[in-house]
Design a protein with these regions (language model features):
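Non-heme Fe(II) oxygenase metal-center motifs and adjacent flexible, charged/small-residue loops
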Residues: 1-291
Length: 291
């Protein structure tokens, strides 16, 4: 069956059986879990960022998405590094950044969205590895984009009925590979599982209903070791020698970035150059987190 726009697939049995048996517990123990905030509210899952930190000068990739503050990037932990190598072998290119998320129960979820491609290398794949309880990813085509808003709720309902939905079960030790064409034309998310335990399959109830998701990406935007300078694909300065200061908590620049993220979320197959072409130097949308 074709998944998404035809540039996506799911891979089973990513890790060898012996590694698969211990991967969830090892990850659960070794990852430094943190809370993340968006629009001053806590997102319903725990998170951690890991990536490729340059040995010579400490520079590192940065992946920006709608969160009040960008998470600190940590060195690859042992199990994540091993999984990354397996994933790279399957997709055929390097993966220098990972957003790791812990879904603590069926109630933890992520709203449907398109990944923000400001910092993602053009032509690369987005790779999501699942460990633990099986959850289902929903893919749904975006609403038809028109220059005018629908005339009525009926128009909106008709648009919604024309949208295609796919459901992709993601069992333990599987890897969902998403191409950027699918990301541009479809939204993806994981809805809360509100079913009583008796209605869930053994794979959905495994690992205490917990799931760890590792999303690997190839990132083309970089920060200096102290996060004071930014350059690369998604920044204003494209070359390291021209790196510019990061911007933190500036309302006007933050809103400009939030608006660009919104355009990518809503538009079908959006033009990267139109949305992001001038570049953004915003690192933290807000300068302070809530207490």
């Amino acid at each position: 069956d074709i998944i998404g726009s035809g540039d996506s697939k799911i891979v089973y049995n990513l890790l060898e059986p012996d590694d698969s048996k211990v991967a969830f517990q090892d990850l659960f123990s070794e990852v430094h879990w943190q809370r993340m905030y968006h629009a001053a509210g806590e997102v319903p899952r725990l998170v951690c960022c890991q990536g490729e930190i340059e040995a010579t000068d400490g520079s590192m990739p940065v992946y920006r998405h709608p969160s009040d503050q960008s998470l600190p990037l940590l060195h690859w932990s042992p199990v994540v590094a091993k999984i990354k190598e397996r994933a790279e072998a399957r997709v055929g290119h390097t993966l220098n950044h990972a957003l790791i998320q812990l879904y603590r129960s069926g109630q933890d979820h992520i709203s449907e969205h398109s990944d923000k491609t400001l910092d993602i290398v053009y032509g690369s794949k987005i790779v999501n590895v699942s460990l633990g309880a099986q959850r289902t990813m929903r893919l749904r085509t975006k609403r038809p984009t028109t220059m005018q808003a629908p005339d009525s709720n009926l128009d909106k309902m008709q648009n919604d009925r024309s949208r295609v939905t796919q459901r992709i079960p993601m069992p333990h030790n599987s890897m969902f590979v998403m191409g950027l064409e699918t990301n541009g034309s479809w939204l993806h998310g994981i809805t809360p599982d509100k079913r009583p335990a008796v209605e869930r399959t053994p794979t959905e109830s495994a690992y205490g209903n917990m799931r760890i998701s590792i999303t690997f990406r190839q990132i083309g935007t970089f920060l200096s070791a102290d996060s004071d300078l930014i350059w690369g694909q998604g920044a204003v300065a494209k070359e390291k020698i021209e790196a510019r200061p990061t911007i933190n908590g500036n309302p006007e620049e933050s809103q400009r970035l939030i608006d660009a993220f919104g355009f990518e979320n809503q538009g079908t197959a959006p033009d990267w150059n139109v949305i992001y072409g001038t570049g953004f130097d915003v690192l933290h949308i807000k300068s302070e987190l809530p207490e």
